[in-house]
Amino acid sequence: MFLRNVRVISLNSRRLFRTMSTVKGKPEDAKIIEARHVKETSDCKWIGLQKIIYKDPNGKEREWDSAVRTTRSSGGVDGIGILTILKYKDGKPDEILLQKQFRPPVEGVCIEMPAGLIDAGEDIDTAALRELKEETGYSGKIISKSPTVFNDPGFTNTNLCLVTVEVDMSLPENQKPVTQLEDNEFIECFSVELHKFPDEMVKLDQQGYKLDARVQNVAQGILMAKQYHIK
């Protein structure tokens, strides 16, 4: 279903890009009904469990429980995170594009960057630009890509590539962005001025939102760059 992103202005004049629709609901309206243990991992579409047997540096045999992706691409990378920077040519400061999305495992609404799994036959660049278009409606240009990073290596083998994309907000195709969300996706996009990003994450945390580690790591990096005068 196609949904239009409608621009609204908050009380502090920060520019927000909210997904508005009479059909789609707000992420905050979702709630957990039940959580039950799964006895057979075959019941799970996206995730499996493994018992890993390995030898430690002293040669002792040990076991490790691990969650695993069942959808890994042939390239060995599960997905992409898209660090999206909105660029203006009228003197407005750069902004970072973020999302609000209800995540059942943490029982709350997460602050995230656009992201998604790499489809079969896709490369990282294609997947990043496709996911950006589907989730936000924007068309952008890839600036850089990170090495493959692992989200929680003590728990799971899931990994991703962090792709930095710039969106030229003066281009006609970015004036009225149209998302292409799946029926089970309820995503609200908003933007924050890049230089205010670390402070805004603190405020969102205080409001009860869950911060995705990738988002907070970027905010912390900006804060450290300022603190230690890194150029």
UniProtKB/Swiss-Prot annotation:
Record protein name field: ADP-ribose pyrophosphatase
Keywords: Acetylation, Hydrolase, Magnesium, Manganese, Metal-binding
Annotated Nudix hydrolase domain residues: 75-214
GO MF entry, a single one: ADP-ribose diphosphatase activity
Record field: transmembrane: none
Binding positions (substrate): W46, W64, D65, R69, R103, L117, D152
EC number per UniProt: 3.6.1.13
Cofactor(s) the record lists: Mg(2+); Mn(2+)
Binding site for Mg(2+) 1: A115, E135
Motif position, Nudix box: 116-137
Protein encoded by which gene: YSA1
Note: Present with 7330 molecules/cell in log phase SD medium.
Disulfide bond entries: none
